[in-house]
Amino acid sequence: MIEQAVADLWLPIAVLIMRASWVSPRKGQANVSQMHYARQGVVTEEMAYVAKRENLPESLVMEEVARGRMIIPANINHTGLEPMAIGIASKCKVNANIGASPNASDAAEEVNKLKLAVKYGADTVMDLSTGGVNLDEVRTAIIDASPVPIGTVPVYQALESVHGSIEKLDEDDFLHIIEKHCQQGVDYQTIHAGLLIEHLPKVKGRLTGIVSRGGGILAQWMLYHHRQNPLYTRFDDICEIFKRYDCTFSLGDSLRPGCQHDASDAAQLAELKTLGELTRRAWKHDVQVMVEGPGHVPLDQIEFNVKKQMEECNEAPFYVLGPLVTDIAPGYDHITSAIGAAMAGWHGTAMLCYVTPKEHLGLPNAEDVREGLIAYKIAAHAADIARHRPGARDRDDELSRARYNFDWNKQFELSLDPERAKEYHDETLPADIYKQAEFCSMCGPKHCPMQTKITEEDIEGLEKVLEARGAAELTPVKLDKAD
């Protein structure tokens, strides 16, 4: 599959060849995490590569990784990976979810979804397969084909391994699956360790209860066994596993709100406090962490949610699903959530998990993946502009120049979705001659305002005329009402 990635030119060939040599000397060491090296003052090859991608000094990348404000999810067994960064100092990133369900899809289709997600700009991809196929086969196929970091939710496979019987799951089952995912090259795993048994009564006043699949599994486990969350009690053991592979924690928010009514409630905030504790525990092991967030949040509560996470979790990168800012638009939740995502990114969220038009309705197909990703690339880019990240607006300015100069092909090329931009233009003006035309079908050949080209000479000449006439002539005449 790596050979196919080279053939597809997904990655610079040098990276595919070089990363294997980067990680080879590290294998077998007790701790191979990027944070571990950064805290020793070592700039790894991954850090240097990320610094170039982000146009940041290598020293800053190392300092941010050591501090925990930046992560580089890069399992040493995922050698076909192009290193990337998630953190407040880097550009806002977008994750795409794919995965087979018991009712739909197979390994080949999921790899095709991966390719589509990468094509449309996914910075990371999560495999959320829950059953119906050989989960290990699907996961390894995705990892082998992927140039971007791959994330998983191991509790799904833990439950599948006992054929859905919660009562048969024990603590070792969870840890066995977690290590298997690390061995296969998973770069980050959603670990729902922040949901405690004492949190469960706090969901009583909610409209939608627990909407996290992983959180729901662990809630059922605790209710059946009347014991504490095993991912919490065995958290240090998970850290020991993660640091051997440089797998990153994505601390799951099991109690994220599933509707506007439940946003920022006691259950959500109680779990967030525990996630802060777990972040610091992972850092003691030099293990990288990002923290997951809601969900469904009204616009006026988004800033509070981002700042609260930064406060509780010591500014570990925040990774949010949406959030959706209204609940009344099934079929359009890529829009309702992209609105919230842009605002969350503006306030400091490091990565946005895309939502597709199929959210709450069904398993996304290829077109849904495209629609969701483009919506979220827009949101992330808007956040980068709002945060004044260096170079964030360069592409906008270049496209605007092309638009003003009626350079249609350049406009298409610079678009987030060049195929869609060209398709819409060509619906009414398909002939090649119209690629040089100084109009589109909206205004036609005579009414496009951008045909009015005002030069510096025009302005200078006008200024001289105005100066000669004097300001008095330019003062508006007040007419009497009778006139």
Curated annotation (Swiss-Prot):
Keyword annotations: 4Fe-4S, Iron, Iron-sulfur, Lyase, Metal-binding, S-adenosyl-L-methionine, Thiamine biosynthesis, Zinc
Pathway: Cofactor biosynthesis; thiamine diphosphate biosynthesis
Enzyme Commission code: 4.1.99.17
Iron-sulfur is among the record's keywords: yes
Residue ranges that the Swiss-Prot or TrEMBL entry lists as coiled coil: none
Residue numbers binding Zn(2+): H296, H360
One of the record's GO cellular component terms: cytosol
GO MF annotation: an example: 4 iron, 4 sulfur cluster binding
Gene3D superfamilies, sorted: 6.10.250.620, Radical SAM ThiC family, central domain (3.20.20.540)
InterPro entries: ThiC (IPR037509), ThiC/Bza_core_dom (IPR038521), ThiC/BzaA/B (IPR002817)
Binding residue positions for substrate: N97, M126, Y156, H192, S212, R213, G214, D253, S254, L255, R256, E292, Y319
Region forming the signal peptide: none
Residues holding [4Fe-4S] cluster: C440, C443, C448
Reaction catalyzed: 5-amino-1-(5-phospho-beta-D-ribosyl)imidazole + S-adenosyl-L-methionine = 4-amino-2-methyl-5-(phosphooxymethyl)pyrimidine + CO + 5'-deoxyadenosine + formate + L-methionine + 3 H(+)
Protein's GO biological process: thiamine biosynthetic process; thiamine diphosphate biosynthetic process
Principal EC category: lyase
Cofactors required: [4Fe-4S] cluster
Cofactor: how bound: Binds 1 [4Fe-4S] cluster per subunit. The cluster is coordinated with 3 cysteines and an exchangeable S-adenosyl-L-methionine.
Record function comment: Catalyzes the synthesis of the hydroxymethylpyrimidine phosphate (HMP-P) moiety of thiamine from aminoimidazole ribotide (AIR) in a radical S-adenosyl-L-methionine (SAM)-dependent reaction.
Family under the similarity heading: Belongs to the ThiC family.
Protein name: Phosphomethylpyrimidine synthase
The species this protein was found in: Parasynechococcus marenigrum (strain WH8102)
Taxonomic classification: Bacteria, Bacillati, Cyanobacteriota, Cyanophyceae, Synechococcales
